[in-house]
């Protein structure tokens, strides 16, 4: 007798072992038809999986997130099937699920073209319509490796050799195609109805640039056409908002081959940067942080003591001078510990909060670089809090409050919080981890925040809170972190004198709100589609004269506004006013101030807000008051 416990708490009993599909059919024909897989005692399995013991089972359909993953994974295999039918000489490698879709890497003797993608997608649709059953079988390692070698699939054979001896080797087949996979997969290809191939990109075998270059075909798959249409529309909108395009259009920054991964900031872009940095500086100063500055280049011995030289060297830029090895700092933490150590610290000095807009460099692979989002040289709004164990919850509460307020000011209302918990390999005792993890939970609870827990995802030196902001397109970006560190103070010898005159290690909290300034500015540009709120905009207003006769008044007006702290420019060019208005509208300036003879004579301005909104004619004082009202909440 086999007892199956369902999600609603009910128990069904079967006299013999049953498959997931049979359980679904016993519940109802509709569920049997909709079933894509099952979750057996928490593990995803195929509908063909036989259950021969008492277990908990949930039937997975396309209404479940796991169901969508199964569809995407199966569609990746459908892609490989179609490629092998159309291009038999192509070799298949791997095809995982990624955010919003999947990819599959191929080795082929020529580049795939857009026309190839159209043919492949059409063949995928044809195979899906055949509704071919997908079957799974478990085989020996030798049988699997021998099979793939016999059909010339050397990459699959290599993957099999790297699979742990304790793992099962599963082969999935549909039609004439067999692939190696952990699964699970849909029961038949007819379940795959909504998909689209997106693009081809280069990729290295096993992600190593020393290996062969492959071709990666990206695709997306969904349960409903409306969802795919919505996703494709979002991609179109994202293309319009691409910070690289807007950076050029708005004359904010550029990048060039002579300095890969580094940014050349133009005056308008640097003005935007300064607004963000000055705002962040105000906020951390008000929160009791002390701003410091640490060296960009430090001796190898410090990086060895911190552990970075042994564990992070391949990502560090190094140099040598007078027979000494140095590294350009990839992060600020070791330098902040040096400041803390400089002098005897007492428990009365704690908490100490050191902040730095620290310039860091990391030797990212050239293929991973992406505009402002992935660079080699960047500035972090970095800070480290040194406190006692009794103080760290209060410090965490204060940081949560500060971070959420900052995100709101920048226009981000939806923040997802994730708490990464202890990994298997870790420093410190279980009791220390218990206190650390519960302390971060208590801090989040005290702030009225909800969070998702990620078991095993913490760093070996402590648990971490991550702050993921959602932009206007619904995309999630991890920006902020609050990382508890149980190791670095010990490694670098940081200590303070406790109340009982003993020497103790401080608790160290690494924290950032925006993270990389470059990346955050890229996110901001895309979130606002380049139309920055007035408090951030490089220019808050531009004064435009209609004819030469108003040039003197327009110039005087510009100077008056500048003296009142308005970021304003004057456009006195001898061009048609319609041309000038259009140009500055495309530059997304918040306010255009137009002056003609009437405005000059009455000492007024005609105000146009962004979006072509006509605010009418008003005295300059009234405009300044309106602008100040816009800015008041950020002063």
Curated annotation (Swiss-Prot):
Q: Which residues form the TGS domain?
A: 1-61
Which enzyme class?
A: ligase
Classify the source by domain of life.
Bacteria
| Catalyzed chemical reaction(s) | tRNA(Thr) + L-threonine + ATP = L-threonyl-tRNA(Thr) + AMP + diphosphate + H(+)
Instruction: Enumerate the subcellular locations listed in this protein's record, separating them with semicolons.
Output: Cytoplasm
Q: Which residues take part in binding Zn(2+)? A: 333, 384, 510
Give the cofactor note: Binds 1 zinc ion per subunit.
Cofactor entry: Zn(2+)
Q: Name one GO molecular function term.
A: tRNA binding
Stretches that traverse the bilayer: none
Subunit arrangement?
A: Homodimer.
Annotated protein name in UniProt: Threonine--tRNA ligase
Q: What is the lineage of its organism?
A: Bacteria, Pseudomonadati, Pseudomonadota, Betaproteobacteria, Burkholderiales
Annotated gene: thrS
């Amino acid at each position: 007798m086999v007892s199956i416990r369902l999600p609603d708490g009910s128990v069904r009993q079967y006299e013999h072992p049953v498959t997931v599909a049979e359980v679904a059919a016993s519940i109802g024909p509709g569920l049997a038809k909709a079933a894509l897989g099952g979750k057996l005692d928490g593990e995803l399995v195929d509908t063909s999986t036989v259950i021969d013991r008492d277990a908990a089972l949930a039937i997975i359909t396309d209404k479940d997130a796991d169901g969508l993953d199964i569809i995407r994974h199966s569609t990746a295999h459908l892609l490989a099937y179609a490629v092998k039918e159309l291009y038999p000489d192509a070799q298949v490698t791997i095809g995982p699920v990624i955010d919003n879709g999947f990819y599959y890497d191929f080795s082929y003797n020529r580049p795939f073209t857009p026309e190839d993608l159209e043919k492949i997608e059409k063949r995928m649709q044809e195979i899906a319509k055949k509704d071919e059953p997908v079957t799974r079988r478990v085989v020996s390692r030798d049988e699997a490796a021998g099979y793939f070698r016999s059909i010339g699939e050397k990459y699959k054979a290599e993957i099999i050799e790297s699979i742990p001896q304790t793992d099962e080797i599963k082969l999935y087949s549909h039609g004439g195609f067999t692939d190696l996979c952990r699964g699970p997969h849909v029961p038949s290809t007819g379940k795959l109805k909504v998909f689209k191939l997106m693009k081809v990109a280069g990729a290295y075998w096993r992600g190593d640039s020393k290996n062969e270059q492959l071709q990666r075909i990206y695709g997306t798959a969904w349960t409903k056409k409306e969802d795919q249409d919505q996703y494709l529309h979002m991609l179109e909108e994202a293309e319009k908002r691409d910070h690289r395009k807007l950076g050029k259009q708005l004359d904010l920054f550029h990048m060039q081959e002579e300095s890969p991964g580094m940014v050349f900031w133009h005056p308008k872009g640097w003005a935007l940067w300064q607004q963000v940095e000055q705002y962040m500086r105000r906020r951390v100063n008000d929160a009791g942080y002390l701003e410091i500055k640490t060296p960009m280049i430090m001796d190898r011995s410090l990086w060895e003591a911190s552990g970075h030289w042994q564990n992070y060297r391949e990502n560090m830029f190094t140099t040598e001078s007078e027979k000494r090895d140095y590294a350009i700092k990839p992060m600020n933490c070791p330098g902040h510990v040096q400041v803390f150590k400089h002098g005897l610290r007492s428990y009365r000095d704690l908490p100490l909060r050191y902040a730095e807009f620290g310039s860091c460099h990391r030797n990212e692979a050239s293929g991973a670089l992406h505009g402002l989002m992935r660079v080699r040289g960047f500035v972090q709004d970095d800070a480290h809090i040194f406190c006692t164990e009794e103080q760290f919850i209060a410090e965490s509460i204060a940081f949560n409050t500060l971070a959420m307020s900052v995100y709101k000011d920048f226009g981000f209302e939806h923040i997802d919080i994730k708490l990464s918990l202890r990994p298997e390999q870790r420093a410190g005792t279980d009791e220390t981890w218990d206190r650390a993890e519960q302390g971060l939970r208590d801090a989040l609870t005290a702030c009225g925040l909800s969070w998702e827990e990620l078991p095993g995802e913490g760093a070996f030196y402590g648990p971490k809170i991550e702050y993921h902001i959602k932009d206007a397109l619904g995309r999630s970006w991890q920006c902020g972190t609050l990382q508890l560190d149980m190791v670095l103070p010990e490694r670098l010898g940081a200590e303070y004198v406790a109340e009982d005159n003993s020497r103790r290690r401080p608790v160290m909290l690494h924290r950032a709100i925006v993270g990389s300034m470059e990346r955050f500015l890229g996110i901001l540009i895309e979130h606002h589609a380049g139309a920055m709120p007035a408090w951030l905009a490089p220019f808050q207003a531009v004064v435009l004269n209609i004819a030469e006769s108003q040039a003197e008044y327009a110039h005087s007006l510009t100077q008056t506004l500048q003296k009142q702290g308005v970021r304003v420019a004057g456009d006195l060019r001898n061009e048609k006013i319609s041309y000038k208005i259009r140009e500055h509208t495309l530059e997304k300036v918040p306010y255009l101030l137009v002056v003609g003879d009437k405005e000059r004579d009455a000492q007024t301005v005609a105000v146009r807000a962004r979006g072509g909104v006509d605010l009418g004619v008003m005295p300059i004082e009234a405009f300044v008051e309106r602008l100040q009202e816009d800015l008041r909440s950020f002063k």
